[in-house]
Amino acid sequence: SAEGDELIVINGTEITRKFPPGHINAVFVKDANKLINIDRSRQPEVDEYIEGLPKDLIQEYIDEPWLNDGVLAALWPIEETLMEAKNQEAFVFWNHPAWSSEEESSDKLLHEIHIDLFNQNLIHGIEVVNGIWFSDEAFQIAIDYDLTIIGTSDVHGLIDWDYLQRPNGHRSVTLILSEDKTEKSIKDALFKGRTVVWYKNILIGKNENVQEIIDASLSIKNAYFKGNTNVLLVEIENISDANFQLSVNDGQLIENNPNIFSVAPHGITKIEIGNSKSTKVNLGVDVLNAYIAPNTHPS
């Protein structure tokens, strides 16, 4: 359906297991059917499991064939499933580790099985953002285990219902810093961890990737002295869709703004720097709507 369009459709599938490890996605798969292994001889285990589920949770699904087969499929060891995904050269990431329905069953996100899967290179990324949820703990796990940082909208209905009706709303997305717009380049970038998440106008990622987005978005468009004064008028341009929040961190005096100011999407903000001696601008700022680690802004 995307033929002749700029849209790139990438094959993928979800791999669901009881937490831990939880929900996992595999993209760039070649045959999703090979990631399902149903052994009918284990039906008694399925019956016992379904019998133990809360009735109010499964009542509307109890007669659906997919419920029974889904539980059967989940009995296949996760390591074997992910090894098949690896054989298909798929990119695999851990979904919504901080999702409330899973978190309630455990006092921590990270378990030994997750670490084992990381160490075997069977999981390559982790969602630090899912829909309206952001997890500092998942962000730290990504940094500690060098996982690709992922953010998704997890939209099950219409995007308008969840996002676009809000003022300045946008869906949570993963910005992929690929060499070009091809499936191969996108896949290479994901495996190399070259991503930044854009969530509620916040950029989240590893320092080098976030800095690349900032450098590509913001620039000094013009700088000139105001009349015969030593006040330098500086025009800062933002060519991106994000609204940047900047805080001056080098002690320079901003005369027409507080030391915290914003640069609107596709806009220009003018600031006046006092006691300037040159039109060469070297302004130190923290980017307040970006994080390169939990509670850490890039400078």
What is the role of each PLM region?
Residues W99:
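Glycine-rich phosphate-binding "P-loop"
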Residues S1-F91, N95, E103, E127-F139:
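A metal-dependent hydrolase metal-coordination microenvironment
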Residues F19-K30, E102-S299:
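Charged catalytic cores and adjacent phosphate/nucleic-acid-binding surfaces used
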